[in-house]
Amino acid sequence: TGLMPIQVQAMTLAHHLANVSWAQEATADLTATTPRHHGGWRFCPHCLGASGGTWLLQWRLMWSFACLQHRCLLAEYCPRCGRRQRAPQPLNAAPPRPVHCAHPSPTTTGRNRSRCDADLADTPVITLEADHPTLLAQQVLVELLAADSGRFGLYAQHPTPVRDVLADIRILGRSILSATAGRHLDGLLP
């Protein structure tokens, strides 16, 4: 590739591995990075369209759910075929067009099916006000993932490793959803 190993590593999620892995030993296996991850990438249609199809690595992390630049929730599914994006493709598949869905068209059958090819830049997303709690939470997580420890809220007096803060957030989130069955979430989104 002509790149130094450190340059290649910077283009991967390896720098997040120690903070987001709950495996006993951190490995380069992406499934260890995001246990029970849904298998696709979320994405900001505005970012995809503006960049000509560049997928940001941060979208792969389960902690990414909103685009701070465009103040919207990230999309997860193709607007035409309804499938999650960036799933593994067959080895014999032709490279997909940037910004377009690479999944086989839902209206065709057979081995050499045409692609869905929907323009992902046209995917509708929920836009949020600049001070919406979801965007504030995403900003806190972005800053946390870039740090060596959590130093906000209850962690301000006792800096805590990022991995432990993320584990606390997961446990708290699961507990809230379990206790309320999600009943109180309706008023949080526009």
Which residues are covered by each model-predicted region?
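C-terminal accessory regions
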Residues: 1-63, 68-190
